[in-house]
Structure formats: structure tokens, C-alpha cells
Amino acid sequence: MSLLCVGVKKAKFDGAQEKFNTYVTLKVQNVKSTTIAVRGSQPSWEQDFMFEINRLDLGLTVEVWNKGLIWDTMVGTVWIPLRTIRQSNEEGPGEWLTLDSQAIMADSEICGTKDPTFHRILLDAHFELPLDIPEEEARYWAKKLEQLNAMRDQDEYSFQDQQDKPLPVPSSQCCNWNYFGWGEQNDDPDSAVDDRDSDYRSETSNSIPPPYYTTSQPNASVHQYSVRPPPLGSRESYSDSMHSYEEFSEPRALSPTGSSRYASSGELSQGSSQLSEDFDPDEHSLQGSELDDERDRDSYHSCHSSVSYHKDSPRWDQDEEDLEDLEDLEDEELPEEEELEEEELEEEEELEEEELELEEEEEVPDDLASYTQQEDTTVAEPKEFKRISFPTAAPQKEDKVSAVPIEAPDVSKGIPKAATPEEKAAAECAQEAEPPKSEESFRSREAEEGQEGQDAMSRAKANWLRAFNKVRMQLQEARGEGEMSKSLWFKGGPGGGLIIIDSMPDIRKRKPIPLVSDLAMSLVQSRKAGITSALASSTLNNEELKNHVYKKTLQALIYPISCTTPHNFEVWTATTPTYCYECEGLLWGIARQGMRCTECGVKCHEKCQDLLNADCLQRAAEKSSKHGAEDRTQNIIMVLKDRMKIRERNKPEIFELIQEVFAVTKSAHTQQMKAVKQSVLDGTSKWSAKISITVVCAQGLQAKDKTGSSDPYVTVQVGKTKKRTKTIYGNLNPVWEENFHFECHNSSDRIKVRVLDEDDDIKSRVKQRFKRESDDFLGQTIIEVRTLSGEMDVWYNLDKRTDKSAVSGAIRLHISVEIKGEEKVAPYHVQYTCLHENLFHFVTDVQNNGVVKIPDAKGDDAWKVYYDETAQEIVDEFAMRYGVESIYQAMTHFACLSSKYMCPGVPAVMSTLLANINAYYAHTTASTNVSASDRFAASNFGKERFVKLLDQLHNSLRIDLSMYRNNFPASSPERLQDLKSTVDLLTSITFFRMKVQELQSPPRASQVVKDCVKACLNSTYEYIFNNCHELYGREYQTDPAKKGEVPPEEQGPSIKNLDFWSKLITLIVSIIEEDKNSYTPCLNQFPQELNVGKISAEVMWSLFAQDMKYAMEEHDKHRLCKSADYMNLHFKVKWLYNEYVAELPTFKDRVPEYPAWFEPFVIQWLDENEEVSRDFLHGALERDKKDGFQQTSEHALFSCSVVDVFSQLNQSFEIIKKLECPDPQIVGHYMRRFAKTISNVLLQYADIVSKDFASYCSKEKEKVPCILMNNTQQLRVQLEKMFEAMGGKELDAEASGTLKELQVKLNNVLDELSHVFATSFQPHIEECVRQMGDILSQVKGTGNVPASACSSVAQDADNVLQPIMDLLDSNLTLFAKICEKTVLKRVLKELWKLVMNTMERTIVLPPLTDQTMIGTLLRKHGKGLEKGRVKLPSHSDGTQMIFNAAKELGQLSKLKDHMVREEAKSLTPKQCAVVELALDTIKQYFHAGGVGLKKTFLEKSPDLQSLRYALSLYTQATDLLIKTFVQTQSAQVHGGKGTRFTLSEDVCPEMGSGVEDPVGEVSVHVELFTHPGTGEQKVTVKVVAANDLKWQTSGIFRPFIEVNIVGPQLSDKKRKFATKSKNNSWAPKYNESFQFSLSADAGPECYELQVCVKDYCFAREDRTVELAVLQLRELAQRGSAACWLPLGRRIHMDDTGLTVLRILSQRSNDEVAKEFVKLKSDTRSAEEGGAAPAP
């Protein structure tokens, strides 16, 4: 920085003398100075001005103005580049410059002028040379400094990648003070915005406009001119900023501050800088070394202005014993050269020794991890460092004492790389290395010189020492010594005082990635202690800070704000123009213009009196002291003393608590109380401070212009000093970044910051003449100076000045304060943190054994009460006195509580606290539209610190919730409430992230809790699985004998038994129930998203299912357990699923898997169950048999065996049913297998009953067979019920088919049993029917019965029915009682058939031979009569039986004899009428009025139909019967198949199909002829030949062919012809013709030819060989044809034919009938010499 001196001498104007009344303004950087106004065309001002210059790329603007009545006009201007201004310590004659009329602008800055005028001005401008150091001495020191630089360059440290450029010496400077570091003062463009907390850093803007630097000049009104940002990357920039390189990863804008290391009288320097974003942490290099070049161009300006006020510089040691008052250095003389050299050489030697020591120590010590992990652990108190006289090294002791780390500033930016070895070594050196000896020697020497009062040290030596110390500091830092050597009080950069309190330098860069064991250990520690102490208790070990806070606390409490004296205002009349002390507005009016305090004399508007809240007594004391009113002052002091005594007497507990909290001895406390009282009495008279204010930016301002915008600028006033910023045109969110410096000597002063809208119009010009402020008011904020300390970056809401003000928005200020005597103290916010944390530690850990004592407070502000009454008053008064916001108090208390968040009741308090913190930041007010994130970013607590605190708290809460069952046991209602509050706290953290941090999608609290619950359940399941037997034995085993220890190898599941799984299910249920009943009501904040009971069931089931599935697969391979055990386990699993899992949304619409696990075991059980059921069946039948098949009850008609069998089956089915298998496919498998079991069991029952049933029927016990039939029917009934129970129509198709098939089989069995039972009555019925026949034969009378004889017929019918009715009546009555209805009907049907068939074959159609043969015939024949037909269907068995009967009687001749011998049994018409009537009676009897068989069944019964048909045939003539036979019997030989027709007998056709047993064929030619006149029909038959005859005989075979015509009305015609016989020919040729005459009344369809091949035998009857039948209807269309007829062994006929044959067989007197019977009864004779013919 250089000092520019400008002398405005005189000017020459072109114009009249009276025209000019001119003054000159000088503008450079952002400072404007103005001369007085002088009249005339050749004015002479002769005024000198001085400016601090830190940028030589700008220019000096000189403007000459002519003063006017309303506004001023510019005469001309000239722009002088600063680079062209000479350097000299002497004034020159000046230079005449021509004024131009216009300025040339570039980027809103003047860069030249144009359009010359005729006016000229004489100016003398020069830069003052720094000191008066001789050239020779300057060269000497430059050489020495180069040697030191060379030493530094030889040391290979981590920033060697990009060395600083050589420092050129411009020719215009006699000495380049960049060598000494003074040219490098604006080395940190980031210092104003970048707090160590990163609280006030803008995270979104990387394009903040260039900064504006301001320096204070006497008599200068402050205007603004921008300067370009200072270059980056100097060595000093690094040396001042080693503490901040953990923030490199954050891109940030250049800082607005331009504070100099050595500021002018009105300026407070920022002192230290921070490494800019251009520093590359990976390459450890500084990018760009333009700073040196720039600094080369800056000249040193004034030793006075650069040294005397630079108390905030790190190169200014504040220890009084180390450094004299710097202002006195101006007058010190230069020491002797020899002394200087000697000292310098000593220093060099010590540096070299130190360098060697450091190189030896570069290896990383073993305990480096203890440092690198200090982010999470408290660092032990390091060794005391001796204070070094170097300004940069001096604060080392305080730093090490207070090196309790807080947090890396920005967790969200990611963890930086692990520290390099050089950094680790540097850190170790910073912790362990003893300070060099030279420090103590130099320090002691300097102290001695100060004590001896030697004033010989000159400015040169002082400056050289500073340069020397700076270089040495750089060397130390390069080796790592200076890394941690910054003091807590170090004022470098914004928030420099917070460097140790609120951040952890180098931690994020240096901390290596922890090992797994480290992580595990840290988790264990976090479980015990909560959040790490680095976040919660950063000041407990900082004794120096605690000592200071102790004093400040006493000061705040001995005379608290709440006890201050208010002003005594009264209405006051001003006699001269007076301005309001508060708003600086004129007190308008003629009289009674405002208010005046009678005590301290402050004047203000009536509306402003409430804004003046400073203590009146102290203001009065200050004022009277300054004005010499000592008596008045003494009175005030006495009042103050009394008040403090009263305070101490009334509230002794407060001061006792303070003493105990800070562990101060009683004597020291007493002394300190006296000192504090005296400081209060001294008041503000001895108080002074330096204030540096950076106006950063504003947001959301009011629009005052018609364009909808404003042109805002800011005025800052401290006391009577007022400065302003540059105007930002047309912007409601302006950015100024301008820095102002003030001196303040009154702690009751206020900083008044006003935002105004610049108006450049006539109205504004006029207003300017009458008002101090002609511009529109946009808002203001008033800041009490007493609330400032250290550095702070704060957003202030803009307030109204009057009720009419339209104000909105907020302004951001960076304020740095140095209070005399407290230069090294931390900001009040840090001091408050120290107080609060120590108080919390004392109250919680010391007094209450680590348990947080929660105050009992109620009301809306209860959350602001942190302690009991005494402790709360301490923190509140401290906060009130020193301007600590309540939100800062809340955040600090939240941080303290975070270390005890697991203590009872704490989560609820933390949740409430955070909710109110959220509300404070997220709920913006109407007066500002600043976003929540911006408001939070401006938090004095530290944005990154609080975010990291929440992040770490969030992680810890998640870990604790992941073990909620241990940390919050369900047995403790208090802990359950804490659990609920913990979730509320998580919700508040989520709200904070979403609303305050404005993160896009932070993890939802409900999801976080859900994940934690699942994690806990996973671990819980694993625990109970691994310790199942032990836990079960402890919790549920009541039998002491069973509580034996389970061997470790049997702790888990076994394939030998299933006990483990049953116990595990019990434990799982207990877990789910606990979650359902205890934790679900507790964690009810998210009813739609989180239900702990349901999640518990879901997780437990999922894990259990996985293990159970694998276990069952293993069991399936070995099958070592009983199937019943598997079934029992299946039921337990089913219950578990249905009770807790089935209704869960995840499983609701899914088919569960568990039935599939047990399917093999259920099938196994069903297999075994079938065997059991069969055994049970046999046992039941045996018991039933022994008991005689007794009815189970009076109303039950079946015996107990059926009940027993189905009871067992139903029990088995109930077990399957109770499985409630939800898988339809598996249910189908079960049903199929069980259906087979049912089928096998019931069929076996039916088989056993069927085998023995006949034996029961043979006995005279009708009851037992009936009960057995009832049992069979009951099987069918119960089967139907079981079918419905198993699903009915919904039953599996295969199972359903099995059961239906079983039902059919049982039905057939019942039919068979009924038939057997009815057949047992056959002998009795046949006997009764014979008796009926006998009675019937006695009925006399022939012909039709007249109507008059009906009564006699009825009587006869009754007589005939008597025998059978007696039998039926006696049995059917019994059957009706003991038979099931269905069984009864079946028995009745069988009896009905038996009665009908017996009557038919005994009465209507008596047998051809004995009764046995006829009975057999009819029985077999009866089977074909069930289809309900009027004409009986074809059935060949009857004919065959007649033939067989004939064969049994021997030859046909015997049959004829038999028939002749039989009495004529043909029924008369009357007898037929009697039989008809009897049939009706029997039918009515079997119907039994609806109780028995249905009438429709009886009417359509084929047996009745057959009987009636036979009766009807009795009345028909023989011809009609024969006609009926021919028309109905179309399949008498080979089923009517095999017959072929040709046109000529010469053509032999192929063999016919359908002939299964061919015995030959015969060829005949038949021709039909009808006489056209008479209608007489003739048939000519030509017997051609016989072929393939099959016949064996012992004698000569002499075959011949006999042809018979069969039909009606042939009694008078020839009916038979025969050919001649052929000897021994089996294919004889005959060629003989015969002619038959037929009746004209019947057509060919009524006739047939029967061809019979016979073997001629002499003296005996011819033997029949084969038979064939040709029905003439087949020739009706042909007329004539050659017929090939297959020969058969016999004639086949159906029932009709058989009936006709039997009726005709009884007509012994009718030749035609006898012939017909013989013809149709003929059959193949027995062969001789061979086997008998097949039947």
C-alpha cells in the first residue's frame, strides 16, 4: 500500500472573474475529497490531500466544479494514471494540466478524458517513499532477505510445485517493500465473506462483483470507485491461511474486503487472509503469483498509518510485555549497525538449528492417528508452548490449549484426500515440537529493552524485524511448524477468532480413512457418549477463553441489561437547528420540537425515543466525564456502586454458580469481582474500539423508481462518522462488497446502517438543500456497539424509520471489532458458546452425574428455557448484554444436548428445540424475502457446523433406532416416550434439510425409521435364531427338569427333530406382539407409512420363511421325524402366517409359499392315514359283526361301522381342511390323494359286505341284510356329504372324478346287494306263484268274459292272488320298517321283477321242461327286459336256452313226446282276464299309495310289459302268431348277416361278412310270382348246391336239403320239399326246383324260407347238419335272385319269438303250431367220430 499526496494549488479559467466560484474534488479508488470554494477566474486553493493506495492500475480523477444556487456545474476534469505519478518525499512545483470537458468510461469506471477546454489547473502529485532508509542499508537488507529466501527454497515442502516468481524492483521505487511483506497486504480476497465456520459463505454465487476497498481520510466524504481484485497466491497468503485449507474444495467468489495489513487511522485491518479457491489442494501449489508483481507496483506510504493501527494483524503481538506501543515506534532511532548484524546472525544460526531439528522429525510419529482422528475424539491437552515474540508465532500457546476440534466445515462437499506425509509431519511438528530457543531469547531481549526504556530502535529496525519474522514464519509453516500455531485470538480473516472454536483446521485433509476397527470403536464410543465431543463441547479445555468468558459473565451479571436505567425524556424546545440523535433528522417546528433526556441530555424525535435503549446512567457518566463535571460523575458512580452491591447481595447464587462453573478459587473470584465492578464504574470513558464493517449485499429491497427498480446505496454511521457505498443502479438485490473502518470511543454508540435510493433529479437537488438525506429511504438497521466482538457475518432485516416507511428486504454485513484491552478475545458468540457449554457441563456432568436436568417450563417460550432459574438468568443476561440472538442460544443448547441425546427426556427437548429453529429460519416474515437457506447461511452459529452436527446426530439416531429394542426397551414407558421423541427429532432434521437447507429430496423420516426398524428386526431375528433354545428356556420353560442346557452343537435347527422351529415361532410371535403392542402405539407419527407391528411381521416372516424353506428341503431328504410332527409344525406355521402376515399389503394378494414346504410331508401323512383308515375299517366291521349289525339308534337304520369309518375319514379330512392351505394347486394335490383314500376305504368296506352278504340272506334274518344294504346306502350319502365338504363343484377335477366314480361303484354294489337279497325270496315266490297257477287253472269258462261276470272275475283274481299276497304282505311290512327309503325301493323293484318274471314263466308261459331250466331261462332272459319297450328287443339267448333244453331231453322226438304228454296249459280268455286283474292288484300293492314304487316305473316296467304281451299273444290265432314271428325275427342265423344275392347262380360272390363260425353255405335261386288276375303268389325255389359243409360221421355222409315255407294261412298248402341225397359229398350239387303257393291275403314280408341240410339215415331219423333262413321280404323288390345263404348250427330268436314259440308249443292240437315249434326248435345234431357241436 502506498501513500499518495496531492496538492491542489491553483487554476486559470477562461472567462469573466465573477463567473467562477469553484472547488476541486479529487477521487481515487472509492474515496472523494473536496477543497473549499474560491471565487475568481484564477483561484488559489493550496490544499494538500493524502490517499492510501493499494492498486496502481487505477487513476486519480480531478474535477473542478462551479458552485450554483440550485446545483453545481462542472468546469472540467482531468484523469491522471497512478502509474505516471512520481515517487518522492518532497513536494514539487506541480504541473499545469489542461482540463477536459468529458470523461471516458469503461465498465462504469473512468479510464480517461476527452474534449479539452481552455481551463488549466496546477497540481502536485507524488507517492511518499517508505521511511527515509538509505539506499545502502536497503540493499544490505535486501541481500539478507534473499539469503533467507534461498534457505526457504532449499527446504522441500509440499508447496514446491509452483514457486513464487522473483520479486522485481521497479525503477520508480527506491526500495521494494514487498520483500518485507508490506506490499502484500491485500492478500486474501476471501477474508470478508469466508468465516471459519463457513457460516456466512455464499454457496450459490461464484460471481460476486469485484470488491471495493475503502480507506478513511480526514475531511473526506466517502465515494466509491471499484478496484480490480488483488492477485492471488502470495507466500503470505499461504502463511496467513494454513488454518483454512480444508475449505479449498468450495468454489467461492473473490472476497470483498480490501483491508490492509497496516491500515490508516480510520481503518481496522482484516489481518489475515484465507487461501483462495485458486489453491489446488491436490498439487499443493498456489496458482498464480501475480500478487508479487502487483505488490511491486504498490509503494509504502506511511509508517504511521501502516503500523499504528494494525492491531488485528497476525504480525502484531498483543502481549504488553512483548511489544511496546507501536505509535511510539515512529520516534525511535536507528540502532547501531553492529548490534543489528549481531542479532540477525544469531537469529540465522537458530533458524538453521531449528531447520535441522525439523528435518529429523519429519517421520510420522506413531501417535499421529490420535491427531488425525480428533474430528471424533477429544484431544488431550498438549504441551504449553512458550510465547514467541514473532507476531505469527506468538499465539501458539492459546491455540494448543484450545485445540479441541469442532468439525470440518462442509460435510456435504465430500471428504478430502488423506493427508500427505508432509502434512502429517507438519501437523505433528505443530503438536509436539518445542519452540525454537531463539523465540525465547528474542522475546526476553525485546522485553528487556522495553523495560530499560531504550528507545533507540528505529522504524527501519522495527520494519526489518517484521520482515524477518514473516520470512521465518513462512519457513516454519513450510515445515509444518506454523500449521497449528494460530492463536484463538488471531484476528486473521473473518471469523479468525472462531478458527479453533468453530472449525477443525486440516482435519478433513489430514484425517486418513479409518480402519474397520476404528469405525467399530467409534460406533461403540458413540453408543456410550452420543455425538462426539468435538461437536458438543469445543471450549471445555480452553482455559484462556474460559477465563475471559468468566470475567465477561461477571461483568454482564453484576450490572445486567435488565437493570439499566432508562432515559428520562421530557419535551424540549430547540433554540437552534438540532438533529435527532437517533435518525439524524432535523427536529422540525418552532417549539417543542423533540424529546430530551434530563440525565444524559440526548435529544431525539418523539418517535425515536424508544429506539434509544442504551443505559442512561452510563451515558451520563461518560458525558459528564468528558466535560469535566466530576461531581455529577461521582454521583452517578455512587448510584452504580449501590446497584451493583444490591445485585450481589440479592443474587449471591448467581455469582457462586459462575465461580463453580469456571472453577475459580474464592480469593481469585473476590478479586475479579472488584475488578469487574471497577470496569463497570469506568463505564465507557476508558473504552475504545476499532470497527471494520463490510457492506456485502442486500436482498429484496423496495422499488422506489417508476421503472420498478431502485438505485440503492448504503450509508454506515458510527457515532458522528458517516460513510457511504457506491450506488448500484437498477438493482433490488445489489452487491457492494465495500469495507469501512471506524474508531469508536463509546460502547453505548450504535452502528446505523441505512439503505437509500439515489435520485438524481431536480426534486432531489432541492431536497438536498434542506435535508441531510435527499434520497428515498429503503430501510435501516441499528446495531448496538456493545453487542459486537470479534468478527461476524450477519444478515439484518431492514427496519422502518417511521410508520410511513415502505421497507422490505435484508442487508448482509461483515463486522470486525477490536476493543482496546480485548484485542485477542473471541467474538461474543464464541464467548457465549464457551459460557453455555461450560454451564451445561457443570450442571449435567458435575452436579447431576451425567444426567441432563430438564427445566420445568411452560408457555410458548418454554423452549428458550435451558436451565433452572439461576443458570438460565446467567445465559440470558450474557446474551442480552452482548447481543447474542436467542436463536444462537437455542442452537448452542441443541449442540450441547446432542452429546447427551440418549439421556431420558433429552430427545423431546431436542425435537422441540430443532422445531423452533426450523420455524425461525423457514418461516420468513413479511418484511424480508430472503430465502431460508440464505438466512441460515448467515447464522452466527456456523452453517457447516450445524449441518455437520445434524448429519452426525442423524447418523447416530439411525444407529440407535436400528437397535431400538435394546436402547428403548418396551418395559420402560419413559424410554418409549424417548423413542417417540427421537423419531420426532428425526422428522425435525428432515424438515430442516428440506425447508432450511432447501435440499431437493432429503431422506424422508418415515423411510429412515422404517429402514432402522427393519435393521433392528434383522438383527433381532438373527439373535433369536442363534440363541433359540436358550431364550425359549429362559422365557417360556416352566418345567425345571426341561431347563437343562442345550449343547452348543444342538443350539440350531436339527434334522432329527422339529423342536427348534416350534420354539423359534414362539419367540417370533413374542417379538411381533411386542412391536405391535408397545412400539406401534409409540411410533405413530407416520400412520400411513410406518406401522412397526406390520413391518415386524413382514421382516420376521421373510427371514423365517427363508430358513424354514431350506430346513424343510433338508428334512424332505432324510424324513427322520414323524409325519404328525411335520403336520403339527405346519399348523404352527399356518397360524403364524394367518395371524400376522396374511393381511400385510406385501402378502395380501400373493399365494404364500409355506404350503409348498410341507406338501411332501402332508402327502406322507395322507399315505399313512390311508393305512390307518383301512385298519380302522376292519376293526369297525369286526365290532359291528360281533354286535350283530345293530342299528346305532332308534331312528338310524344303519349300524355303527359306517359311522366309525366316516368318523375316521372326517377327522382326517378336518385336519386337511384346518390346514387352510391357500395354494389351490396344492389343495388339489391333497384332495386327489384324500379322494383315493376315501375310494379305497369305502370300496374295501363294500367288498367285505358283498362277500358275506349272501350268507346273511340265506338265514332267516331279513333284518341284517337290510341293515347292510342301509350301510351301503349310508356310504353313498356320507360320500356325497364329503364331496360337498371337499369343495363340491369347485373340487379338483381329478379328485371329483375319483369320488363320482366311487359313487357309481357303490350304486352298483347296492344294486347287486338288492338283487341278491331279492333272489333269496325266489323259492317262496315260485311256490306261491305255483299255487296261484293251480287256483287259476280251476277258473272255468272259455271265450270272452261278459260284463255281468266281472264280479266273479274279481273274486277269482283275489283267490288267485291269495298265496303271493300273503308272502309279500308279511315281508314288505318288515322291509318298510328296517330299510332306508332308497334301499326299500331297490328291494321292491327286485321283488317286482321277480314276481312278474315268475308269473310269466310259471302261469302265462310255462316251461318246456322242468322248472329249473325254465327259471334259468327266464332269469337270463329277464336281464334284457329293463329298457321299457313295448315290443321286446332282439335277444338270442332265450332261443338258445330252448335249444339247450331240447338237447338235454335228447332227440327232438323226445321233445315232441314231452310236449304231447304235457297237459294243455293254454289260458282261456277268462283266465287271461283274471290274470290281468291280478296284475293290476299287485301293481297297486307295490305302489302302496305312493310309499312304494312309482306308478310310472310300474307301468313302464319291461317285466310287466313282457307279461302283458305274452297274455295278449295267448288270444291270437296260430297264423297271426307265426306272422308276428316272421316279421319280428330277422336275425335267426348269424344275426341275419352273410347272405349274398347275385343275378345268376353261376357267379359265386365273395364270402359275406359277419359270419363268425361258418359251417357251410347253400346256393338257391328264388323267384317270386304273383298272378295278375287272382293275386295268387307262388315261390319257385331252385336248390343249386351246398358248399363247404362241415360235418363228421362214422358212416356214409348222405346230405340232402329240406326247404320249408313258414308263414300264415298255409295249413291247406304244401309247406315242405326235399332234394335227393348225395353220398359222401361235402359240396353236393342238386339243381332241383320246388314251387310253393302262398296266400293272396299276405305279402312276401310275412313269409320266409327255412333251408335245412340233413344227413339221410335209413331206419332212423335224419340228422340235422345246418340251417339257414331266407326272408322273402328281401326279394320283394328283386323278384328273383340267386341267393348264397350261410348255414348255421341253430335258429336264434328274441323274446318275442321265444314267447310265440312257447305259446305255440302249448297248442298240441294244432298241426301247424306243432310243426312250427319243431321247425324253429331244430338244431344241429351231435356228430359221430368227432367233438360234439358247440352250444
UniProtKB/Swiss-Prot annotation:
Zn(2+) 2 binds at residues 597, 600, 616. Plays a role in vesicle maturation during exocytosis as a target of the diacylglycerol second messenger pathway. Involved in neurotransmitter release by acting in synaptic vesicle priming prior to vesicle fusion and participates in the activity-dependent refilling of readily releasable vesicle pool (RRP). Essential for synaptic vesicle maturation in most excitatory/glutamatergic but not inhibitory/GABA-mediated synapses. Facilitates neuronal dense core vesicles fusion as well as controls the location and efficiency of their synaptic release. Its cofactor is Ca(2+). Belongs to the unc-13 family. GO terms for molecular function: calcium ion binding; calmodulin binding; diacylglycerol binding; identical protein binding; phospholipid binding; protein domain specific binding; protein-containing complex binding; SNARE binding. Residues 1358-1525 form the MHD2 domain. One of its GO terms (biological process) is synaptic transmission, glutamatergic. Changing residue 1655 to E: Loss of binding to STX1B and priming activity. A zinc finger (Phorbol-ester/DAG-type) spans 566-616. Residues 264-276 have a biased composition (Low complexity). The modification Phosphoserine is found at residues 239, 241, 244, 255. The C2 domains are not involved in calcium-dependent phospholipid binding. The C-terminal region containing both MHD domains and the third C2 domain is required for synaptic vesicle priming activity. Changing residue 1190 to R: Loss of binding to STX1B and priming activity. It is a peripheral membrane protein. Ca(2+) 1 binds at residues 705, 711, 757, 759. InterPro entries: C1-like_sf, C2_dom, C2_domain_sf, MUN_dom, Munc13_1, Munc13_dom-2, PE/DAG-bd, Unc-13. It comes from Rattus norvegicus (Rat). Keywords: Calcium, Cell membrane, Cell projection, Coiled coil, Cytoplasm, Differentiation, Exocytosis, Membrane, Metal-binding, Phosphoprotein, Repeat, Synapse, Zinc, Zinc-finger. Expressed in brain, with highest levels in the olfactory bulb, striatum, cerebral cortex, hippocampus and cerebellum. Also expressed in pancreatic islet cells. The keyword Glycosyltransferase does not apply. Residues 193-202, 434-448 have a biased composition (Basic and acidic residues). This is Protein unc-13 homolog A. Residues 319-370 form a coiled coil.
